[in-house]
Structures are given as structure tokens and as C-alpha cells.
Swiss-Prot record:
Name assigned to this protein: Glucose-6-phosphate 1-dehydrogenase
Function: Catalyzes the oxidation of glucose 6-phosphate to 6-phosphogluconolactone.
Transmembrane portions of the chain: none
Cross-link (Isoglutamyl lysine isopeptide (Lys-Gln) (interchain with Q-Cter in protein Pup)): 51
Gene3D superfamilies assigned: Dihydrodipicolinate Reductase, domain 2, NAD(P)-binding Rossmann-like Domain
Chain residues that bind NADP(+): 94-95, 154
EC number annotated for this UniProt entry: 1.1.1.49
Any one GO biological process: glucose metabolic process
Any Gene Ontology CC annotation: cytosol
Tree of life domain: Bacteria
PROSITE patterns: G6P_DEHYDROGENASE
Residues holding substrate: 184, 188, 222, 241, 345
Cross-referenced PANTHER family: GLUCOSE-6-PHOSPHATE 1-DEHYDROGENASE, GLUCOSE-6-PHOSPHATE 1-DEHYDROGENASE G6PD
Length: 495
């Protein structure tokens, strides 16, 4: 079935950091693909803003080369590329110099803007320290209209205090309903499907609690190193970069109560309640229930790779590239159910998944049949493939057949072979529509930091040194110990 996307209203899409890595890899390809599918209005313009000394033609040449690198060849159409490039403008601005922003205003109010540009999307694809100054300069230049939106990339700050400072600075210019704090994990089809699976099927909800669920695992593993992001990453680490935002947002969708409606406020209200119910970790619990690691040299696939310290050119760096945490939620539904979270770079393979493992049957009923009865698991794969599968026990055909685990699976690519928008494509169109349902609200961000920041502080107080793990493995040995001491094991990975 061919699904035609609903067109969005004309807008000016302004990307601060328009020549950066995020714009080249994610934002501009996503906007091109929405143009390819006819979702961008004819008058929509895309304005790159950066310090680079480019004019419109130079920027278009740069973006053309970027599309060739980052868009699948069969999705590149020369006519669409030309149409897309014709939308582009470039403004050379020193983002730290407020007076430079007058040039942005000149482009926004230029005659080629037409009359349909009340909607202005300001995408801040730059360092969080610039969020406040950029918004302040936009406000001072009178460029923020009632229909404007601002998009903030994670992480929002380095800790609770800096997150609050950013939120205050941005909130002084934009109303909360205009602020879109993006987490691209929430735009993944399988993450959204989790809500439908939970709340659209009557059989699952009675099982979704501590009486039936043994534990939950949330994993985001990457096989790549830090690459060009070394300067940023060495000041952040895995907890700030991934766990405090991506993994906690996924945890919220797994653990939240049914919202009154699936709308912009109800879903976010329930996510906030989960974050506020996370049990704070004491110094002793942090020592016992968290693991940090840093990758050393090793073999990823067939490639010999160097260590993290070699990549960031700092032989003494103590930044964690791996973190695992055992967390608990203090409410009736989840009391006693551990949530195991882990994320790392230079792991054995790239995959992200949610594993909900159910408790075993109370009494084995088939002692005379060979084979094993594995626990039931609901596995939601987020990447590289998006899929949902239910693992259960079945008997092989024949009299005396063995017991073995089987899967009931929904693979999105197989079930829906037509191409669907990726996470950034979906979320960018939600921004233009003004729908913040899948974006983080201020209170969510600050609640997440309120839980995560003490962990960072306990590590610092204990002078925690990340354990080295070989690149191409599943992290430090301590990560396996964290879950195996509870009689459980990690799902996925090289094992």
C-alpha cells in the first residue's frame, strides 16, 4: 500500500551549525527525503547559518556533496536534488556575536520568502553552551514570531544546574510550547510501536507489572568509536551522551502508566512521573550497581582499531565510553523489578534493543520431554533493524519432540516493504506541525538530570577509573558480573 505523507505548511527552516556533522549526516538528508516524498511546501526555505565563509552557491555545492555521501543512491533523484538545493540559503554568522544575527533577519524578511513563512524553525545543531546566546540574539533582533519553534539537541546541559540555566535562557525568549527538545530515539518506528503494543492490545497490560515481569534490559551498543566527536565526547562521556537522555526516555515508555490521551501533554506527564519515581543511587549503590569502561585497542569485525585515548590524543583521559546501571522504579507496578541499562562504543556489534523478560512458569509441567524451557521475552529491536518479537517455548513436531524456544516476530521491513520515514524525518515534520508529543519537556529533562547527576558525583568522589575493555567486545567484564550476580544475563552481543 502506498502511503502519501500529509504535506506540512510552508516554513523557514534555519539550521544553526548548518555546515556541521549533524546537519550533513542527519538534518539535510532528512529534509531532502521529505522533499522527495512531496511533504515540503513549495515555498519552504532552508537557511544554513555558520561561521564558514560561504555564499548560497558554495553552500549548495557543499550540501550536494553531503547528500551524495549520506543518502542511499536509489533515493537520489537529480530533479529532486536540484529542487531541494534551490531552497537553500546561507548566512555567515559568528554565533557568539549578537550583532551578526541581523544578517539572519535580512534573509528571513527577504522578498523571496513569500507570505507563507509565519512558521520559523530554528534548529540549534551546535554546542549547548550556545543555546542561550543564540536564543537571546534571535529575540533581540525581533526574529521570534508566535509561530516560531526552536529545536534543541541533546544533551541539554552537563548537569542539573546547567540544564536549568539553558532552560531559563531559552524560556526567556520562547514559550514552552515552542521549545522542542529532540531525542531521535523517540522517532523510531519500533519505539512508537511500543506504545501501540502496550496500550492497543488487551492481553499484554495484565502482564505488564512486577507480578509477571522478571526484569527489563535496555541496550544501545555501537561498534564505532568517537571519531570526529572526540572533543565533545571527552567532556561528556557515555552517561551524559546516551544514558541520561536516550536510554531514560526509552525506559519511560516501557514503564509509564497509560496516558489519558496520546497527546502532547498526557504522554509527557506520564514519562515525568517515571523519572521522578526512579530510585536515587547512594554512593554505596553507585559503587555496586554501576559499571564504567573505556575501550582499548582491539578488533572490530576485520578492522584493527586503536584505543579511545589514542582517538582523543589524551593518554590520561578517564572519560567513560561504556556505562551500565541497575536501576529501580519506586511505584506499585515496578517494585522489585530491576531495569538494566547499558550503552557503549566500540562494542562487538551495533544494536539497540529493549528486552522485557517475564518470570518463569511457577511449576515445570513437562519433565519427561527433552530440551529447555526458556523464559518468555518480548524483544523490541530499535537498530539496525526495527522489529518486535515474542520468544516463547514450543514442542518440536512428532511424538517425543523436544522443547525449544521459538519466536513470533514482526519485522517492519518485511511487513511494510514500502520505505517509511526515519526518526529525524518524522520528528522534523512534527516540529513544523507544532506537535511536541515525542519531544522532551523541561520538567522531564530536569528530572532525568536530578537522577543522573548524583551518579556522576559519586564517581568523582570515589575517584572512579573506567575499566579498560578491548574494542570489539561487549564491554568490561564487570558489566557481565553486574547482571549475572542476580542470576540473569545480558541479551544480545557477541555471546
Amino acid at each position: 500500500m502506498n502511503r502519501t505523507p500529509s504535506p506540512v505548511d510552508p516554513c523557514d527552516f534555519v539550521i544553526f551549525g548548518g555546515t556541521g556533522d549533524l546537519a550533513a549526516r542527519k538534518l539535510l538528508p532528512a529534509l531532502y527525503l521529505r522533499d522527495r516524498d512531496g511533504q515540503l511546501a513549495g515555498a519552504t526555505r532552508i537557511i544554513g547559518v555558520a561561521k564558514a565563509g560561504l555564499d548560497d552557491a558554495g553552500y549548495r555545492n557543499t550540501v550536494r556533496a553531503g547528500l551524495a555521501r549520506h543518502v542511499e543512491p536509489d533515493l537520489l533523484d537529480s530533479d529532486v536534488v536540484d529542487r531541494f538545493l534551490s531552497r537553500l540559503r546561507f548566512v555567515s554568522v559568528d554565533l557568539t556575536e549578537p550583532s551578526d544575527y541581523a544578517a539572519v533577519g535580512d534573509v528571513l524578511t527577504s522578498p523571496d520568502g513569500g507570505s507563507g513563512h509565519d512558521i520559523r524553525v530554528f534548529y540549534l545543531a551546535c554546542a549547548p553552551a550556545l543555546f542561550g546566546p543564540i536564543c537571546g540574539a534571535l529575540g533581540a533582533q525581533g526574529l521570534v514570531t508566535e509561530s516560531s519553534r526552536v529545536v534543541l539537541e541533546k544533551p541539554i546541559g552537563r548537569d542539573l544546574a546547567s540544564a536549568q540555566q539553558i532552560n531559563e535562557a531559552v524560556g526567556a525568549v520562547f514559550a514552552e510550547h515552542q521549545i522542542f527538545r529532540i531525542d531521535h530515539y523517540l522517532g523510531k518506528e519500533s519505539v512508537q510501536q511500543l506504545l501501540v503494543t502496550r496500550f492497543g492490545n488487551t492481553w499484554l497490560e495484565p502482564l505488564w507489572n512486577s507480578s509477571r515481569i522478571d526484569h527489563v534490559q535496555i541496550t544501545a551498543a555501537e561498534s564505532l568509536g568517537v571519531g570526529a566527536r572526540g572533543d565533545y565526547y571527552d567532556q561528556s562521556g557515555a552517561l551524559r551522551d546516551m544514558l541520561q537522555n536516550h536510554l531514560l526516555q526509552v525506559l519511560c515508555l516501557v514503564a509509564m502508566e497509560p496516558p489519558t490521551h496520546v497527546n502532547r501533554e498526557s504522554v509527557r506527564d506520564e514519562k515525568r512521573k517515571v523519572l521522578e519515581a526512579l530510585e536515587p543511587l547512594t554512593a554505596e549503590q553507585t559503587q555496586r550497581d554501576t559499571v564504567t569502561g573505556q575501550y582499548g585497542p582491539g578488533l572490530v569485525g576485520d578492522e584493527v582499531v586503536g584505543s579511545y585515548r589514542e582517538e582523543v590524543a589524551d593518554p590520561h583521559s578517564r572519560t567513560e565510553t561504556f556505562v551500565a546501571v541497575k536501576a529501580h522504579i519506586r511505584n506499585w507496578r515496578w517494585a522489585g523489578v530491576p531495569f538494566y541499562l547499558r550503552t557503549g562504543k566500540r562494542m562487538s556489534q551495533r544494536f539497540s534493543e529493549i528486552v522485557v523478560q517475564f518470570k518463569p512458569v511457577p511449576l515445570p509441567m513437562f519433565p519427561g520431554i527433552e530440551g529447555t524451557s526458556e523464559p518468555n521475552r518480548l524483544i523490541i529491536s530499535l537498530q539496525p533493524d526495527e522489529a518486535i518479537r515474542l520468544e516463547m517455548t514450543a514442542k518440536e513436531p512428532g511424538s517425543g519432540g523436544r522443547l525449544r524456544p521459538v519466536s513470533l516476530a514482526l519485522n517492519y521491513t518485511e511487513a511494510f516493504p514500502e520505505r517509511s520515514p526515519d526518526a529525524y524525518e518524522r520528528l522534523l515534520m512534527d516540529v513544523v506541525r507544532g506537535d511536541p508529543t515525542l519531544f522532551m519537556r523541561r520538567d522531564e529533562v530536569e528530572a532525568a538530570w536530578a537522577w543522573a547527576e548524583p551518579i556522576l558525583r559519586h564517581w568523582q568522589d570515589a575517584d572512579r577509573v573506567p575499566r579498560t575493555y578491548p574494542a570489539g567486545t561487549d564491554g568490561p567484564v564487570d558489566a557481565a558480573t553486574l547482571i549475572e550476580r542476580d542470576g540473569r544475563r545480558w541479551h544480545g552481543g557477541a555471546a
